[in-house]
Amino acid sequence: MILKVYKLNKNNPLPDYMSHQASGIDLFASVENDVSIAPGDYRIIPTGISVSLPQGYEAQLRPRSGLALKHGITVLNSPGTIDADYRGEVKVLLMNHGKKPFVVKNMMRIAQMVISEVVRARIIEVDEEKQMDKTKRDNGGFGHTGV
C-alpha cells in the first residue's frame, strides 16, 4: 500500500521506518519552540505532516518504547486513530508519567504510526439476550479468571 505524506513543515524529515522490519513509522515533532511537559501533564505536539490513507486503512499513533522507558512519556489516547478520510495535520497527544519535566524539541522522534487494515462491522440489534452467541466465559468480567 502507498502512504501519501504532505509536509506542512518543509524543514522536517519525512516520517520513516527506523529498521528494516519495524512495524511503526517514527513521527517527528514540528515545533517552533521547545515544549515542556510537566510531570502529570500532557500537550498536543504537531508533526508537520498530513497523510492520505487509502480507504480501508487507519493509522494508529503509539508511544515510542524508549521515551516510555527512559522518561515515562506515552501517547495519552493510545492508540490514537487517524481515519482514512482525515486530511488535517497529524498531532500527537503526549503525556508525561515521569518524575521530571520532559522537553520536546523540534525534529525529535515523539511517537510511531502503525498502518492497519480496518474491518467495518455490520451492526445488528437483537431483541433478547438469549440471541447472543454463548461462550464458556459468558459475562465474566474484570478479574473473573483470577489475579
Listing of model-derived features with the role each one plays in the protein:
Residues 1-147:
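DUTPase catalytic domain/fold
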